[in-house]
């Protein structure tokens, strides 16, 4: 398949003897995860996405479990542990002009208005109040609040972000 996929969940350990698996959403909420139509799976150590044939998805409190079709015991289910679940990028909702998918920020180079480099975005921390870009340059790590006040410009096609931020903040 030549289309781009976005990871929305990761499969964890087996849950029951009948082959159910723990499912860890990478989306903001379990409801968001469950709202996507067709899911695809990428087994560990492969770059191949295959359409996922799920039998059922069970939500209990804040946990999610998945039962894959034709997987009827824990031994068979173990080969799916640490597999990724994805959806085609085209399946994601269209964003407003001032919105971005956080995954698109990963790998962006970050410089300030003085052209000082903060390296590249390697992670995003969700604090509740706002998100924070985790940028790495050589052996240094910089935490930059991802708020309009500090983001001067973003060019996601060129993977570049300009911030109004200094090393000593």
UniProtKB/Swiss-Prot annotation:
Boundaries of every PRC barrel domain copy: 97-169
InterPro entries recorded: PRC_barrel-like_sf, PRC_RimM, RimM, RimM_N, RimM_N_sf, Transl_B-barrel_sf
Localization in the cell: Cytoplasm
GO cellular-component term (any): cytoplasm
GO biological process, one term: ribosomal small subunit biogenesis
Pfam (any one): PRC_RimM
Keyword annotations from UniProtKB, A to Z: Chaperone, Cytoplasm, Ribosome biogenesis, rRNA processing
A GO MF term: ribosome binding
Role, per record: An accessory protein needed during the final step in the assembly of 30S ribosomal subunit, possibly for assembly of the head region. Essential for efficient processing of 16S rRNA. May be needed both before and after RbfA during the maturation of 16S rRNA. It has affinity for free ribosomal 30S subunits but not for 70S ribosomes.
Subunit structure: Binds ribosomal protein uS19.
Domains: entry comment: The PRC barrel domain binds ribosomal protein uS19.
Family: Belongs to the RimM family.
Protein name: Ribosome maturation factor RimM
Organism whose genome encodes this protein: Francisella tularensis subsp. holarctica (strain LVS)
Lineage of producing organism: Bacteria, Pseudomonadati, Pseudomonadota, Gammaproteobacteria, Thiotrichales
Gene transcribed to yield this protein: rimM
């Amino acid at each position: 398949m030549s289309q781009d996929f976005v990871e929305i969940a990761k499969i964890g350990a087996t849950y029951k003897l009948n082959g159910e698996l723990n499912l860890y959403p990478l989306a903001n909420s379990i409801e968001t995860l469950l709202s996507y139509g067709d899911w695809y799976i990428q087994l560990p150590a492969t770059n191949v996405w295959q359409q996922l044939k799920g039998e059922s998805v069970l939500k209990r409190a804040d946990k999610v479990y998945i039962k894959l079709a034709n997987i009827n015991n824990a031994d068979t289910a173990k080969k799916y542990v640490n597999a990724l679940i994805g959806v085609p990028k085209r399946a994601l909702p269209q964003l407003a002009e001032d919105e971005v998918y956080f995954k698109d920020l990963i790998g962006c180079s970050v410089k300030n208005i003085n052209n000082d480099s903060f390296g590249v975005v390697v992670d995003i921390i969700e604090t509740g109040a706002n998100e924070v870009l985790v940028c790495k340059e050589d052996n240094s790590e910089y935490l930059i609040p991802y708020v309009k006040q500090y983001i001067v410009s973003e060019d996601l096609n060129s993977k570049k972000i300009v911030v109004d931020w200094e090393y000593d903040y």
